[in-house]
Regions:
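Low-complexity, intrinsically disordered short peptide segments enriched in small/polar/basic residues
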Residues: 2, 6, 10, 138-139, ...
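Charged, glycine/proline-rich intrinsically disordered loops and linkers
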Residues: 38-41, 87-93, 166
Length: 184
C-alpha cells in the first residue's frame, strides 16, 4: 500500500470514529432514503437523520475523496448494498471473504442484498487484534448495525459480526481492498 493510500485510510478511519453512536435506521422498501451519495452533511444532520450500513460507508468513501458512482444497474438503489455489490462486481473489485487472510485496514466487508429481510451488510476493517494481528476475526470493524438493543454506528469484532447471524457459514461474502475501492 502506498503512503498516499495509507494516509487516506488513516484519515478516513479517524472520521469514522467521529460517527460512533450515530443512530442506525433501517431502510424500508419503497421509501425514499438518502444514502448520502452526493454530500457529507454536518455531523449534527447525520445524527438527526441516522444512517444504515451502506449510507455510513458512503460517507466514508466520500470522506476519502471519492464520488459515489451514478447508478447504471437495474433494480438497485444508488449507494445501497445491492448497488455496491453490482458496482464492485462489474469492476472486478470483489474477492471472496476468507477469515484466514490478514486484510489491510480500511478493507470493506460485504454481504449482498437478498431481500427486504436480508438487506445485506457492509462494514470497514478498523483495527487489528492487538495481541496477534493475523487473527482477523478478533480484529475490530466499524459499521452501522442493529444487534439486540443496539442500533448505531459502533465497533464490534469481525468474528462476532461474521458469525452472529449465520453461525455455520458466516455472514460476510466479499472483501474489497482499499487499493480497489479507492479507485472509485
Amino acid at each position: 500500500m502506498t503512503d498516499k493510500i495509507a494516509d487516506t485510510i488513516v484519515k478516513t478511519i479517524d472520521y469514522a470514529y467521529t460517527l460512533i453512536g450515530t443512530p442506525y435506521v433501517l431502510w424500508k422498501y419503497n421509501e425514499e432514503y438518502d444514502f448520502y451519495c452526493d454530500i457529507i452533511p454536518s455531523t449534527q444532520e447525520i445524527n438527526d437523520n441516522g444512517v444504515n450500513c451502506a449510507s455510513f460507508v458512503n460517507l466514508l468513501i466520500q470522506y476519502a475523496g471519492r464520488k459515489i458512482p451514478e447508478n447504471t444497474f437495474e433494480n438497485s438503489l444508488r449507494g445501497g448494498t445491492d448497488f455496491w455489490f453490482k458496482y464492485f462486481n462489474s469492476k472486478d473489485m470483489l474477492t471472496k471473504f476468507d477469515y484466514t487472510i490478514k486484510y489491510p485496514l480500511g478493507t470493506l466487508f460485504l454481504r449482498n442484498y437478498r431481500n427486504i429481510v436480508d438487506q445485506g451488510h457492509i462494514a470497514m476493517l478498523l483495527e487489528y487484534y492487538e495481541k496477534d494481528s493475523s487473527k482477523i476475526l478478533y480484529s475490530k470493524i466499524i459499521h452501522a448495525y442493529c444487534y439486540k438493543d443496539i442500533r448505531q454506528v459502533g465497533i464490534t469484532t469481525l468474528g462476532h459480526s461474521h458469525f452472529s447471524i449465520s453461525e455455520n457459514t458466516g455472514y460476510y461474502e466479499y472483501a474489497i481492498l482499499p487499493i480497489k475501492w479507492l479507485k472509485i
